[in-house]
Amino acid sequence: MNYLADNPRRLLMKREHPDFFRVQRDLEAAGMTFSAIGNRFLLDRPELLQVQCSRSLTEPEIQSRVAFFLAAARQGAVLVSPAISPGEKAVMRAAFDAGFPLVYLQENGFTDLAKPGGRRMEACANGQLLILAPWAHHNENLAIRRGQCLALNDIARRLCERR
């Protein structure tokens, strides 16, 4: 779809759900503080399920994990992950494509005027996506480090064990 031709539709989405498209600062969950974009009420859903997959999974094992997590999402679970490993990416992509609710953790925070783009904007408008950033925004194009990956997975675990 042409970007300019799509402007009126995107504006309508932002007007109908303004809170889903504003950066929310100091959002508290499970004793932690985040910057967020999207449907913060996903954190209040009864079941949050962490998606964490070993990098050593084979393709058939990844497909098995995808099936497992999609079945849980069909039953109402909100999937939570930084989507780092190939398996985590496959699960979150399949769930996103199917329209299931997701909480995505990202390493880089948000600028004040940040907005989700493309299909993420659609997902936010539908209330199916929450993007959380536990750390401040940086302009440098930095590769994520192992310690950050471990921390993001620990944050996902803590969000899911909050009760």
Task: Map each language-model feature to its residues.
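Short catalytic/metal-binding and nucleic-acid-binding patches
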Residues: 1-32
